[in-house]
Amino acid sequence: MNKIIIGLAIFANMAFLPVKAEPEVKGWKTLDSMGCMMLEECTDGVRQIKSWRDLGPEYGKFSQELDSIFASMDKLGIKFFLADDKYFIGLTRGLYSVDSNNFFANKKYTTKPSRMLQVIRHEGWHAVQDCMAGTLDNTYTAIVYPTSTIPDWIVRGANRTYMKSVAIFEAEAMAAMYSDTTTKDGLAVCASDTPMWEVYPPTPLTTKWLIREGFITK
C-alpha cells in the first residue's frame, strides 16, 4: 500500500511540473525563427526523423538507400528534422548546419516522397562536403568533385539561385539530388575510418586546404 501511495505522490508531483515554454520568436519565416529551430530551442512543429519508417510506408521503395543514409548519419551523430514552414525563410526547402551537422526539411515542400528524397540527398551531401574539409568538427566545407564533372544545366541553375560564394557547393548538392548513390556512398565513407580524400581525390583547392590544416602532407 505504501508503494502505491509513494507512486501516486510521485505522479502528482510530475503532473504539476512546469511545462517548458517555447522561446519567444521575433517573427516567423525569419532568420530568428530559423536560428531557433536550428539550435533546437524551438520544438513546436519540429519532429526528428530517425528512419524512413518515420516518414511513412510509401518510402519503402527507397528503403535500401535510406537505410544506408540513416545508418551513416546515426554513426556520425547527424540528426534530421522535419519542421513546419513557419521556421524557414522564403521558399527554403532544406537546411544544413555546419555547427551542429544536423539538417532540416520543410514540411510544406516535402509532401511527396520524391521531393523529400531529394532534400535528404541534397542536405546529406553538404555533410559530405563538411567531412571533405577534414572533419565534421569544424565549420568549413570543401568541394568534393571538380566543377567540370557537374552538368552545365545544374551549374547554371545554382548560379541563378545562390550567392556566388556558395553556388559551386550548392551545384554539387543539386547534382547529388538526382543520384541514388552519391549521397549514400559519400556519407558511408565519412562514417568509416578511411579519410574522405583517400576515396575522393581532392581538387587542387581542397588539397591546398587539407595541407594547410595538416590533414595531409605535400
Give the residues covered by each predicted segment.
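Structured segments of extracytoplasmic/periplasmic soluble domains
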Residues: S72, A127-C131, A176-T183
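Soluble non-cytosolic domains of exported or imported proteins
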Residues: G56, G60-Q64, T110-V119, M163-I168
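Metalloprotease/metallohydrolase-associated module, dominated by Zn2+-dependent proteases
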Residues: T141-K218
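Sec-dependent N-terminal signal peptides
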Residues: I4-A15
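Catalytic Zn2+-binding segment of zinc metalloproteases
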Residues: G124-T141
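Active-site scaffold of zinc-dependent metalloenzymes
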Residues: A83-L117, D130-C131
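Sec/Tat signal peptide C-region and signal peptidase I cleavage site
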Residues: L17-K20
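Auxiliary, metal-adjacent structural segments of Zn-dependent hydrolase domains
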Residues: P23, W28-D99
